[in-house]
Amino acid sequence: MARTPTLNFDRGTLILHPPPRGKGWMDYATWDDRVQKFRIPAIRYRSLVEALQAEDVNFIDEAKKFYPVDLVPSLEMEPYPHQTEALAAWKLAGRQGVVVLPTAAGKTYLAQMAMQSTPRTTLIVVPTLDLMHQWYAHLVAAFPDAEVGLLGGGSRDRTAILVATYDSAAIHAETLGNQYGLIVFDECHHLPTDFNRVIAEYAIAPYRLGLSATPERTDGKHADLNILIGEEVYRKRAEDLAGKALAEHEIVQIKVKLSQLERERYNQLIQTRNDFLKQSRISLGSLQGWQMFVQMSARSQSGRRAMLAHREAKDIALGTDGKLRILVNLLAEHYPARILIFTADNATVYRISQELLIPAITHQTPVKERHEILTKFREGKYNTLVASHVLNEGVDVPAASVAIILSGTGSAREYTQRLGRVLRKGNIENKQAILYEVVAEDTSEEGTSARRRGERNNVDAPAASRSQSVPKGRVPQRHGGRREEEEKGKLQVVYGSGKERSLKAAEQLEINYSTGSSKSKNQNSADVTDRVTDASPKRGGDYSEETEN
């Protein structure tokens, strides 16, 4: 009598033996001469199971170690409309996909909603230890009866709900891969790196949710998210949620003129750099321009002078004294509001901290000291903080209402995250947030500013009407940035493809678990069929799983 094929998990892969009948499963399998068995990538688990079930193939699933969990929230909160829409879109996509929401738009609560509607053992992956502890605190409060653990920062728990850093999850991917039915990738733009992607590739999780404010990557690898998690299923911008889930906000760009001495020195340095670039036939605007400049600068004395000139010119633009005069005036105008100051480098952070007696946070700040500073800021003991990059991602400071960018990179992600630091409403009614972007006029900073705001063309053209030139450190008059109320109408789900579908069917989607008799002929055990059924017609994500008890 032929043996029933068995599916096993083996260090990030699947082994199916003996080979079952049918052909559908062969699209995912590769013969492994070392073990004389067929091996399948773990990420193909769902597709493989669906293919076997479609051909009515009996098999024993010993790969799956995830299981249903009882998630009863301690407090029911009414979600914002965009959270309801995003959850419905994710369900319609088969509970696989990426949701793009601005910072502070409630991505954590959306993940909680996804966990409640898909109550399985769940792995949440985050980029930093600060975020790991924030998620842990949220989940412990949300599900007091659930077992929540940590993986990272010295913790090595294995619990039904596990919060892990990307680094730790990647290191343990071979053993975590079959333990969790749902994986939530927070800040999922971190996933498609050579090191981190194994978290998704070595996992059999049939349900996957990616969360990010800016999933796009400069290396183009964000396209891999379609395979690792699923396609983008929902997107909203900060402007779409202003005054609703997010605080009303306005953005003001202040252009500062260099002093005469700074201008003369800046022009001299830029000329030195440009002469070398012209001689070497290098264009910094080309795809490989910067890399070629770095390589050529190491080969000659003139190249080294050009690189040093470039760096000094950049330092002048980033740290001009005019910016500090503007900063002092902005701090005085907005006192006693909570203010976050962002710079591109630690040297400027420490200069501001020392000259203006403002608490500073950089990557060099000890964790205990960082937590103490942030706690005092939240409690109102500190009104102002200055930081470089460490507050860009994942730090919850809802009390902040003013952000001042003195310098930064051309990254749209960094810009979005810095804006998001002041958009969180918290418990503040009618919060009005404002972002100041202070830019040195007629310097490379103007191009950097244009890139991070998505204005890639005509970066040397005059700035928009909101931008104002301030030669003597005066604070400009602000212009209203309030977005007009959207037209009321039929609720729609907007997909990444631009297509729209009515939520009528999505609102009926529920996930139900039922047991039934298995078709397996194994008389020594009873198989439990764990099914996901919807009240609406089945779509690509309808999925049934079989395990042997």
What are these model-derived regions, one by one?
Residues 288-361, 370:
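Conserved helicase/translocase motor-coupling segment
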Residues 152-182, 193-198:
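Conserved helix/coil segment N-terminal to the catalytic DExD/H
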Residues 190-248:
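Post-DEXD/H (motif II) to motif III coupling segment of the RecA-like Helicase ATP-binding lobe
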Residues 393-408, 434-437:
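A short beta-strand element within the Helicase C-terminal
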